[in-house]
UniProtKB/Swiss-Prot annotation:
Start and end residues of each ApaG domain: 1-125
Domain of life of the source: Bacteria
GO biological process, alphabetically ordered: error-free translesion synthesis
Annotated NCBIfam families: PRK05461.1
Pfam families xrefs: DUF525 (PF04379)
InterPro entries the UniProt entry points to: ApaG_domain, ApaG_sf, Uncharacterised_ApaG
Name of this chain's protein: Protein ApaG
């Protein structure tokens, strides 16, 4: 979890066994992000950047406008939650990144998303 003066980000990831195929080096993960506005004014998420790293150190960058097709506006005290997915070639990897946001005055700010793990549950003890 990371906090800024205005925004709190929480991420949870889960392995999707039914969509994965280890024999084909295809490991599918879902991640759910909760974005809470802790400030006194609305904020809007405009863009995202992800750095996805597989267990061999191979990096993939993903960036774009909004999340899951929207640029949510989050009122004070409210939260926005969405679920995304990632496919990697190894049973263990990581994701990290940032969100590009604006406040009610149109001033831009960035919220970092710390590294979180993508892992097949049997690998973690």
């Amino acid at each position: 979890m990371i906090n800024s003066p205005r925004v709190c980000i929480q991420v949870q990831s889960v392995y999707i066994e039914a969509q994965s195929s280890p024999d084909d080096e295809r490991y599918v993960f879902a991640y759910t992000v909760t974005i809470r506005n802790l400030g006194r004014a609305p904020v809007q998420l405009l863009g995202r950047y992800w750095l996805i790293t597989n267990g061999h150190g191979r990096e993939t960058e993903v960036q774009g406008k909004g999340v899951v097709g929207v640029q949510p506006r989050i009122a004070p005290g409210e939260e926005y939650q969405y679920t995304g997915g990632a496919v990697i070639e190894t049973p263990l990897g990581t994701m990290q990144g940032h969100y590009e946001m604006i406040d009610e005055n149109g001033d831009a700010f960035t919220i970092d998303i710390p590294v979180f793990r993508l892992a097949v549950p049997t690998l973690i003890h």
